[in-house]
């Protein structure tokens, strides 16, 4: 069944069901959860096979310990709670002396791969960021790139990889759950992923997952074999 869809279509399906689930418009059980995991994994595997020649690893000694690239699946205004969370994080990174590059990959409910599906939606994009190269939050200024929401994942990935090979960050911080671009970048450079909801682990293929709280006693066995960073 999954072989009937290409990578863009599979990722589109996964994103739409993520939205429906967040809005409590569908209920999932273990079987449907596992199906969604297979959909995401299949999409990732196809993308990886098509792009692996571009994903050459950047050795640690070539990367700048003071530089971090932050990828986010969506960046809107200050009334948008996930955007406020991201701003808090990048401001702290700057206080720690890091040079931070922010990239909005615009992957939140992207239109690429669109197929007929129940109640579809496309993620919002802040028009004022479209041609911006610098973004200011209060007194703090950051280098910035917003990738066109019309680009496919493969084109988004090429754009991010150009930046990464130019600035050579020590690592990538991916904010938001289910960033295919960040998951693929993790093949070239260490990538830590963090959900914008503090209490949840992000959905990611990358091994480094950040949890925005301490691990509870009853979770220790579940997380024992995961590389979970508490923050």
Task: Enumerate the language-model features and the residues they cover.
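Conserved nucleotide-sugar phosphate-binding/catalytic loop shared by glycosyltransferases and other
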Residues: 114-153
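Short N-terminal targeting/anchoring amphipathic segment
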Residues: 69-70, 161-178
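Structural alpha-beta junctions
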Residues: 91-102, 136-143, 187, 226-229
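Short acidic, S/G/P-rich loop/turn micro-motifs used as interaction or catalytic elements
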Residues: 74-79, 107-110, 150-153, 178-181, ...
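Active-site-proximal region of nucleotide-activated glycan assembly enzymes
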Residues: 27-35, 188-231
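N-terminal subdomain of nucleotide-sugar transferases
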Residues: 1-124
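Short, charged/polar "capping" segments at the starts of alpha-helices
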Residues: 108-118, 125, 181, 201, ...
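Short His-Asn-centered micro-motif
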Residues: 71-72, 104, 173-176, 194-195, ...
């Amino acid at each position: 069944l999954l072989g009937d869809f290409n990578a863009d279509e599979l990722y589109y399906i996964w994103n739409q069901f993520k939205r429906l689930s967040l809005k409590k418009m569908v209920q999932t059980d273990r079987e449907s959860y596992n199906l969604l995991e297979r959909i995401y994994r299949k999409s990732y595997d196809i993308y990886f096979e098509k792009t692996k020649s571009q994903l050459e690893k950047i050795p640690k000694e070539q990367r700048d310990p003071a530089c971090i690239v932050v990828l986010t699946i969506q960046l809107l205004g200050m009334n948008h709670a996930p955007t406020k969370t991201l701003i808090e994080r990048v401001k702290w990174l700057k206080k720690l002396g890091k040079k931070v590059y922010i990239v909005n990959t615009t992957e939140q409910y992207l239109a690429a791969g669109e197929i007929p599906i129940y109640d579809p939606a496309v993620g919002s994009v802040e028009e004022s960021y479209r041609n911006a190269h610098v973004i200011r939050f209060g007194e703090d200024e950051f280098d910035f790139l917003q990738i066109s929401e019309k680009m496919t994942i493969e084109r988004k990935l090429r754009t991010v990889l150009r930046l990464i090979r130019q600035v050579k960050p020590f690592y990538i911080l991916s904010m938001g759950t289910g960033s295919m671009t960040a998951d693929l970048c993790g093949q070239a450079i260490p990538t830590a992923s963090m959900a914008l909801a503090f209490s949840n682990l992000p959905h990611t293929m990358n091994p480094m997952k950040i949890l925005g709280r301490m691990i509870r006693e009853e979770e220790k066995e579940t997380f024992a074999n995961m590389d979970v960073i508490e923050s």
